[in-house]
Amino acid sequence: MVRTRLAISVVLVSTLLLLNVKAKSVDPYKVLGVSKDAKQREIQKAFHKQSLKYHPDKNKDKGAQEKFAEINNAYEILSDEEKRKNYDLYGDEKGQPGFDSGFPGGNGGYSYSSSGGGFNFGGPGGWQNMGGGGGSKSFSFSFGGPSESSFGFGMDDIFSMFSGGSSKGKEQFGGFGSSSNAESKSKSSTVAAIKTINSQVYKKDVVDQGMTWLLLSYLPSQRGSQYHESIIEEVAESLQGALKVGRLNCETESSLCKQLGIVPRRAPRMFVYSYTSSGKATLAEYTEELVAKKVKSFCQEHLPRFSKKIDLNTFDVSAVSSQKTPKVLLLSTKKDTPVIWRVLSGLYNGRFVFYNTEVHDTSDPKIQKLGVDKFPAIVGWLSNGEKQVLKTGITVKNLKSAVQELGKLLEGLEKKNKKVSSKSQAGQAPNESSEKIPLLSRPNFDSICGENTPVCIIGAFRSSNGKEKLQSIMSKVSQKSLSRRQASTTGSQDTVSYSLLDATKQSAFLSSLDKSEFKTSSDKLLIAYKPRRGKFATFKGDMTIEEVEKFVAAVLNGDIQFTKTRQKPQIK
């Protein structure tokens, strides 16, 4: 029996030696097709191009799987500065001369890795498992390992592969290891920009921060995570300042994955954490081809959209400036809302009301009235109606610096607005109000009476006298503490808004609520409207400050019965 075991071991060792002699040392620079002074960006691009070409899921040629493994081994060396340095000096990423230079007796040695139906010889730190089909696994043997054996594993390990003998190799991985072991060694330097997400990080850095995230969910045993991460890195680099990236291990963070509704599959999954126009966070999965350009486009599509595009011909500046939150307007030659502005609208959502408009001619009287002489430009309004030209002829170095610089401009405007608001409150008598109730129009309707506002108190008038009466009453009532009660969820937006409506011009708006009730000779009426629920209630009492205040209080306390609208009301 001993002789039989010895004979088998001699045959196996001889075979391994023969294969190692035949295995040529592969130049990772040649594999990726880059020069020896190539920068990381060039290496990344070359890796993406080659990986896409030879990925086993797309390329069914016999040599594709082997070539794919070769490409991944090359990238593992060149993407790690320490391994690359060692390879340049010694021809081996571990800092030891390669096998071709003489059989080393210390730690290390390298010959290229290939993938097939059996074993995978070579590979610097365990077995690679990037891609590949048919459920096959690849193993690496490290020639020139520790003093225990020049092959990195003992004789017991050889026999345990066939007969389940010693478990030593399985526990310590000897000359063959698992994917999680191999990946953990290489990821620390190659994907440092990708943040590891756990429950605490998710709550602190991701939730309700206004920033869009590209998240990778994976299991350590899955194939392809390195390729996914290289794609994510490239996208993150091109969208720095607009996008943050993270990876979520659904094995160690199973509860968080379950909370997010992420179910692990055979391959890693990509999700974009973003915000809808209503402010609600969503998690959208990317399911298309793994190409950086397409992933980037997907991320851009899911950037915040809190800025409302307006037409300067119908933009009511007086209505905008009467609101309490500062307003900012971007004037640019772009048809679509610029990426920078969308990012800022997410980061500062709730602190500003964002608008943008497409412009081309600085000689336009409306542009000149705003005080803008160059595009792009940003104009702001304080809560007291004061206009501020924040910047004109804006130039930026890159997306990240642009978001930072323009963010500082917005924060400066916010500070001015706080000073103006505090002075206004300090100098205002208890029964005095300078609050001007805005007139509802198409540009300001969403910000005043959109779905983000729980209740709108609308004063409809048919004459100038009716308008003045409503303006006086509503401005005083709106300053009362109960009538200004804030939503507890945000603390930044009033539960109730106040506005005026020209009933002669907006008869369709009233008809959409109730076709018959508002056909009256009265020159003024008061309506409470709930946009989210599509319901309304009409004030029936005497039009006095006291009675209107009671009506608003009853609305907020839930003591008023609301009726379903005929259809969703719209402003002409």
Swiss-Prot record:
Protein keywords: Chaperone, Coiled coil, Endoplasmic reticulum, Glycoprotein, Signal
Induction or repression: Induced by tunicamycin and heat shock. Induced by DTT and azetidine-2-carboxylate.
Tissue: Expressed in roots, leaves, stems, flowers, mature pollen grains and growing pollen tubes.
Cellular component terms (Gene Ontology): endoplasmic reticulum lumen; plasmodesma
PTM: Not N-glycosylated.
PROSITE patterns: DNAJ_1, DNAJ_2
Example GO BP: cellular response to heat
UniProt domain J: residue ranges: 27-91
Compositionally biased intervals (Polar residues): 422-432
One Pfam family cited in the UniProt record for this chain: DnaJ
Signal peptide start and end residues: 1-23
Coiled coil segments of this chain: 394-423
Main location, first listed in the record: endoplasmic reticulum
S-S pairs: none
Disruption-associated phenotype: No visible phenotype under normal growth conditions (permissive temperature of 22 degrees Celsius), but mutant plants show gametophytic male sterility due to defect in pollen tube growth at temperature of 30 degrees Celsius.
MF-aspect GO terms: oxidoreductase activity
Compartment list: Endoplasmic reticulum lumen
Glycosylation site list: 431
UniProt-listed SUPFAM superfamilies: Chaperone J-domain, Thioredoxin-like
Annotated region (Disordered), positions in chain: 419-439
Subunit structure: Interacts with BIP1 and BIP3. The interaction with BIP1 and BIP3 activates the ATPase enzyme activities of BIP1 and BIP3.
Function: Regulates protein folding in the endoplasmic reticulum (ER) lumen. Functions probably as a co-molecular chaperone that is required for normal growth of pollen tubes under high-temperature stress.
Protein name per its UniProtKB record: DnaJ protein ERDJ3A
Organism of this sequence: Arabidopsis thaliana (Mouse-ear cress)
